[in-house]
From Swiss-Prot:
Region feature (Disordered): 166-201
Modifications after synthesis and translation: Acetylation of Lys-130 contributes to its nuclear localization and enhances its interaction with KPNB1. Deacetylated by HDAC3.
UniProt entry keywords in alphabetical sequence: Acetylation, Activator, Calmodulin-binding, Cytoplasm, Differentiation, DNA-binding, Nucleus, Repressor, Sexual differentiation, Transcription, Transcription regulation
Cited SMART domains: HMG
Listed SUPFAM superfamilies: HMG-box
Organism: Delphinapterus leucas
Residue ranges: DNA binding: 54-122
Biological function: Transcriptional regulator that controls a genetic switch in male development. It is necessary and sufficient for initiating male sex determination by directing the development of supporting cell precursors (pre-Sertoli cells) as Sertoli rather than granulosa cells. Involved in different aspects of gene regulation including promoter activation or repression. Binds to the DNA consensus sequence 5'-[AT]AACAA[AT]-3'. SRY HMG box recognizes DNA by partial intercalation in the minor groove and promotes DNA bending. Also involved in pre-mRNA splicing.
Name this protein carries in UniProt: Sex-determining region Y protein
One GO MF term attached to the UniProt entry: RNA polymerase II cis-regulatory region sequence-specific DNA binding
Gene it is expressed from: SRY
Family, per entry: Belongs to the SRY family.
Chief location bin: nucleus
Length: 201
């Protein structure tokens, strides 16, 4: 399962041989096996979800770019994968509709096979880690804010500024407080107390 990696594994000759062999031998990346348990889609260890995940069928660009990527990599062994991807995107845009047509037909055939093999399939993209973190922080914020009452003090870093001293909380405008209405949270109790009390009249 594991092997020791040495510097020779990254030599141009070995990389070129790997590129040539890519796609010839069955690999998890291109496998059509639905029981590959998610490894082909995430590159992870498949135990994250209790169910088998199914790869999406390839679209026309992916069908075309599979062979093209190999050719470009062989012609330009020093080119980075990101540069190859940019070049392939540009080359695909430059193809005429007639040149693209066989790849659209192949993609349609693959889609039909996929539909027959997985009739109940529905594409469910995974959330990226950053996106999931933002959603979690929004949920936390939304659970804290509804508990605030109109008279409670909202921390300044949460308030947004409108024009001429008006503020808003949760998208609703709030009138600025008069000098005698300012409140402060005391550190010990968290209770609010008046700072500037109006003089008794």
């Amino acid at each position: 399962m594991f092997r020791i990696v040495n510097g020779e594994d990254y030599s141009p000759a070995v990389q070129q041989r790997n590129i040539l062999d890519f796609g010839k031998a069955p690999s998890l990346l291109w496998t059509d096996n639905g029981s590959s348990n998610d490894r082909c889609e995430t590159g992870g260890n498949c135990r994250e979800s209790g169910q088998d995940r199914v790869k999406r069928p390839m679209n026309a660009f992916i069908v075309w770019s599979r062979d093209q990527r190999r050719k470009v990599a062989l012609e330009n062994p020093q080119m980075q994968n990101s540069e190859i991807s940019k070049r392939l995107g540009y080359d695909w845009k430059m193809l005429t509709e007639a040149e693209k047509q066989p790849f659209f037909e192949e993609a349609q055939r693959l889609r039909a096979m996929h539909r027959d093999k997985y009739p109940g399939y529905k594409y469910r993209p995974r959330r990226k880690a950053k996106e999931a973190t933002e959603i979690a922080s929004r949920r936390l914020f939304s659970t804290v804010q509804p508990n605030a009452h109109r008279g409670d003090l909202v921390p300044l870093h949460i308030q947004g500024r409108l024009r001429q001293g008006h503020t808003f909380t949760n998208g609703k405008p709030v009138k600025p407080l008069a000098a005698h209405e300012h409140k402060q949270l005391t550190p010990a109790t968290g209770a609010s107390q008046q700072l500037d009390k109006p003089a008794p009249q």
